[in-house]
A protein has these predicted regions:
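Anionic-ligand binding region
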Residues: 173, 179-191
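N-terminal beta-strand-loop-alpha-helix module at the start
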Residues: 29-88
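Conserved small/polar residues in nucleotide/adenosyl-binding loops
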Residues: 192-199
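A glycine-rich helix N-cap at a beta->alpha junction
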Residues: 99-123
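Short Gly/Thr/Asp-enriched flexible loops that form oxyanion-binding sites at enzyme active sites
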Residues: 149-166
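Short beta-strand-loop elements within alpha/beta enzyme cores
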Residues: 135-146
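Glycine/small-residue-rich loop that forms an oxyanion/phosphate-binding "nest" at active or ligand-binding sites
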Residues: 120-132
Length: 199
């Protein structure tokens, strides 16, 4: 089940998944940013008495910094340069709405919450892929990893499910017409440039 959120009128390092062909300039570019909720790094984590799970009581949660400062901010910059719309997608329960509303306050046009508890990376990727496919987004932005699990799995899994080109650890993105050119760090601090539309 999807829950949609709209931005209030009185309220701007990532992974990228591309459609095989970007919309031409006459079309509105549709950008999707996937966000997750993570414990604040300043929060003291406690575990249950049997040490099988962490105790969420008293834990301050925030939007994953890689999703906020890299994926969302870069999507908003691209929207400002090229036009289009930015939609936030979050997989999680209603209790996580705070991070969604923060994303809208930062500048996203609208947001969608998949009403499901993330079980693992594959489950989360399947939820993202299903929604992204149904709405035909041009580019999907994700932070390189979450600061709690550091898995770096969801973006690649989502791209595979969408059968779409994927670039991890991107550091720069330029879009011109129906072509996206980007750079990413590789071993030795060299930069790799890729024409995503042709991959």
């Amino acid at each position: 089940m999807y829950f949609h959120y709209k931005k209030q009128k009185d309220l701007s390092i990532f992974g990228l998944i591309f459609k095989n062909q970007l919309q031409d300039k006459k079309s509105i570019m549709k950008l999707l940013v996937c966000i997750s909720q993570t414990p604040d790094t300043t929060t003291k984590i406690k575990f249950s008495d049997d040490n099988t799970a962490f105790d969420k009581n008293g834990v301050q949660f925030i939007m994953n910094p890689y999703d906020e400062w890299y994926a969302l901010v870069r999507a908003l910059e691209l929207k400002e340069q090229q036009g289009g719309s930015v939609t936030i997608l979050h997989v999680g329960p209603q209790a996580n709405e705070t991070v969604i509303r923060k994303g809208l306050a930062i500048g996203a046009d609208d947001a969608v919450r998949v009403d499901a508890e993330p079980q693992n990376a594959m489950f989360t990727a399947a939820q993202i892929a299903a929604y992204a496919k149904s709405e035909n987004f041009d580019i999907v932005f994700m932070g390189k990893e979450t600061i709690d699990y550091n898995g770096s799995e969801v973006a690649a899994m989502t791209a595979e499910m969408l059968d779409a080109p994927f670039v991890s650890y991107a550091t720069k993105l330029d879009v011109s017409g129906d072509t996206a050119t980007l750079e990413r760090d590789i071993e030795g601090c060299l930069l790799y440039t890729s024409d995503a539309a042709d991959e």
